[in-house]
């Protein structure tokens, strides 16, 4: 069949159906969402949990959510902007920060459900494949599925750094090593040491050393915050090791104290009846005084 021109007549516009709002805005892939959200029909009221990972310009957002008719319910959330509390003050959107955010999410969630002592996850970071398995006689491992949104799921994407952090933190998330840094698509082999380097920020440290030797100005420009916070390439691994330990020690979110706001009033408040009567009396007295002065003169 050849090219058929769409005739936009009255019937076309009468029967036109707009797409979902978030599809029109280019925010949600409903083809993927349908498959992530729909639960098995023999599980009835059991929610299907998703690990949502979104990378913005200055932050990494990790959430555990499940879908309801009214909208998605967020069970737990962790953000990269919380990492300065654990000793990571710079590079809050790199692969190592994504791993830390995923780890924080997992430990916080398990702590909330009282499962943090049962499922410790992988304490020693190796970068190798690790899967959480349910322990007999204990509650089953918390299972969820990665929701990468509209991100391109290429090998080495930061989304998978957050996933690895969550798995090492004790969550059961189906995955393979094919999308981790260190996987070679030609030889079909996975090098765990390369992945570990990314988790420990060694790829950034190597680039810092390279720039320091090759172009001092570019180094000062690109790593200005590292210089300001006295973070050198040799400190990187120790910094992330301490952060991982600190996250495991205390993953609980601390609520900020509510800021007292003093309300400002821009218009005059209404007067009470007594104030109005007093004002009238004052005006009367003022008027009478003026009359007396006029009579005297």
UniProtKB/Swiss-Prot annotation:
Q: Which UniProt keywords apply?
A: Acetylation, Cytoplasm, Isopeptide bond, Nucleus, Phosphoprotein, Ribonucleoprotein, Ribosomal protein, RNA-binding, rRNA-binding, Ubl conjugation
What top-level branch of life does the organism fall under?
Eukaryota
Q: Where in the cell is it found?
A: Cytoplasm; Nucleus, Nucleolus
Residues bearing the modification Phosphothreonine: 232
Gene3D superfamilies in alphabetical order:
3.30.420.100
Which SUPFAM superfamilies does the record match to this protein? Translational machinery components (SSF53137)
Give the main localization category: cytoplasm
Give this protein's Gene Ontology molecular function annotations: 5S rRNA binding; structural constituent of ribosome
Task: According to the UniProt record, list the residues that bear N6-acetyllysine.
Answer: 5, 48, 220
UniProt entry tagged with the keyword Transit peptide:
no
List every stretch annotated Disordered.
253-297
For the cross-link Glycyl lysine isopeptide (Lys-Gly) (interchain with G-Cter in SUMO2), list the residue numbers. Answer: 220
Q: Which Pfam families match?
A: Ribosomal_L18_c, Ribosomal_L5e
PTM annotation (Phosphoserine): residues: 185, 272
Residues in cross-link Glycyl lysine isopeptide (Lys-Gly) (interchain with G-Cter in SUMO1): 220
Q: Which family does it belong to?
A: Belongs to the universal ribosomal protein uL18 family.
- Free-text function comment from the UniProt entry: Component of the ribosome, a large ribonucleoprotein complex responsible for the synthesis of proteins in the cell. The small ribosomal subunit (SSU) binds messenger RNAs (mRNAs) and translates the encoded message by selecting cognate aminoacyl-transfer RNA (tRNA) molecules. The large subunit (LSU) contains the ribosomal catalytic site termed the peptidyl transferase center (PTC), which catalyzes the formation of peptide bonds, thereby polymerizing the amino acids delivered by tRNAs into a polypeptide chain.
- HAMAP family, per the entry: Ribosomal_uL18_A
Q: How does it assemble?
A: Component of the large ribosomal subunit (LSU). Part of the 5S RNP complex, which is a LSU subcomplex composed of the 5S RNA, RPL5 and RPL11. Component of a hexameric 5S RNP precursor complex, composed of 5S RNA, RRS1, RPF2/BXDC1, RPL5, RPL11 and HEATR3; this complex acts as a precursor for ribosome assembly. Interacts with isoform 1 of NVL in an ATP-dependent manner. Interacts with RRP1B. Interacts with IPO5, IPO7 and KPNB1; these interactions may be involved in RPL5 nuclear import for the assembly of ribosomal subunits.
Q: What is this protein called?
A: Large ribosomal subunit protein uL18
The species this protein belongs to is Oryctolagus cuniculus (Rabbit)
């Amino acid at each position: 069949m050849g090219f058929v021109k769409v005739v936009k007549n009255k019937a076309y516009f009468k029967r036109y159906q707009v797409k979902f709002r978030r599809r029109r805005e280019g925010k949600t892939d409903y083809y993927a969402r349908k498959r992530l959200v729909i639960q098995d029909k023999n599980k009835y009221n059991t929610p299907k949990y998703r690990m949502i990972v979104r990378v913005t310009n200055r932050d990494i957002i990790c959430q555990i959510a499940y879908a309801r008719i009214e909208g998605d319910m967020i069970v737990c959330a962790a953000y990269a902007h919380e990492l300065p509390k654990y000793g990571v003050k710079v590079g809050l959107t790199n692969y190592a920060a994504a791993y830390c955010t995923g780890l924080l999410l997992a430990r916080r969630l398990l702590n909330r459900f009282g499962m943090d002592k049962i499922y410790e996850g992988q304490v020693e970071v190796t970068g190798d494949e690790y899967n959480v398995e349910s322990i007999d006689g204990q509650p089953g491992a918390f299972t969820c599925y990665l929701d990468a949104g509209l991100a391109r799921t290429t090998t080495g994407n930061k989304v998978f750094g957050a996933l690895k952090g969550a798995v090492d933190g004790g969550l059961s998330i189906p995955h393979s090593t094919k999308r981790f840094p260190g996987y070679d698509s030609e030889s079909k082999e996975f090098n765990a040491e390369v992945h570990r380097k990314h988790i420990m920020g060694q790829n950034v440290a190597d680039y810092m050393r390279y720039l320091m030797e090759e172009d001092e100005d570019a180094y000062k420009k690109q790593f200005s915050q590292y210089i300001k916070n006295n973070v050198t390439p040799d400190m990187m691994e120790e910094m992330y090791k301490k952060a991982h330990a600190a996250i495991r020690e205390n993953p609980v979110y601390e609520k900020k104290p509510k800021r007292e706001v003093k309300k400002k009033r821009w218009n005059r408040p209404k007067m009470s009846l007594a104030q109005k009567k007093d004002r009238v009396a004052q005006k009367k007295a003022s008027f009478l005084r003026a009359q007396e002065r006029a009579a005297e003169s």
